[in-house]
Design a protein with these regions (language model features):
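Extracellular/periplasmic metallocenter environments
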Residues: 33-37, 102-147
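N-terminal edge beta-strand
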Residues: 41-69
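Soluble periplasmic/extracytoplasmic beta-strand elements of cell-envelope proteins
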Residues: 51-53, 73-75, 88, 123, ...
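Beta-strand-rich interaction surfaces with strong enrichment in secreted/lumenal proteins
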Residues: 61-64, 96-101, 110-111
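Histidine- and aromatic-enriched segments that form or immediately flank copper-ligand environments
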Residues: 77-104, 131-139
Length: 147
């Protein structure tokens, strides 16, 4: 490889590295490794509200931060489509036991008050026979409870 070709390859590599933060931030809708974080704020009525959309093996946002001992309302919907999805967070030790058996395009609201700081996974529990689970395909996220 001559010097000019090496320079072109190096330049292209540098371009990819520099543009990755702009174009490669990732969207959980298209990149299962992308993280979209939302920090809930407490409304005037003292409730933390977050809207989550589920779809083609993603949740958006897929990282939600809430405060302990403050009521939470999650409004969970599904993008239009044929594939069934659900939503589950199981952490009874922290006051969290959420299960929406079938997501819909109309919002379904779940209410709970987390009592213990920690990171708790939320997942789609659906799995077709002989296929990866929806969780394994990227339909998972984290509910982080802070003090």
């Amino acid at each position: 490889m001559n010097t000019h070709s090496k320079s072109l390859v190096a330049g292209f590599g540098l371009l990819l590295v520099l543009t990755a933060p702009v174009f490669g931030q990732g969207d959980p809708r298209t990149d299962p490794k992308a993280v979209k974080k939302v920090v809930a704020t407490v409304d005037q009525d003292g409730v933390q509200r977050v809207a989550i959309v589920g779809g083609g093996y993603f949740y958006d946002p897929n990282y939600v931060v809430v405060k302990a001992n403050v009521p939470v309302e999650l409004s969970v919907t599904k993008e239009a489509g044929m594939t069934p999805h659900d939503f589950a967070i199981k952490a009874p030790e922290a006051g969290i036991d959420v299960a929406i058996k079938s997501l819909d395009t109309k919002p379904q609201v779940v209410k709970f008050t987390p009592t213990k700081a920690g990171k708790y996974p939320f997942i789609c529990t659906k799995k077709m026979v002989f296929m990866q689970s929806h969780k394994d395909k990227g339909m998972q996220g984290v509910l982080e409870v802070t003090e």
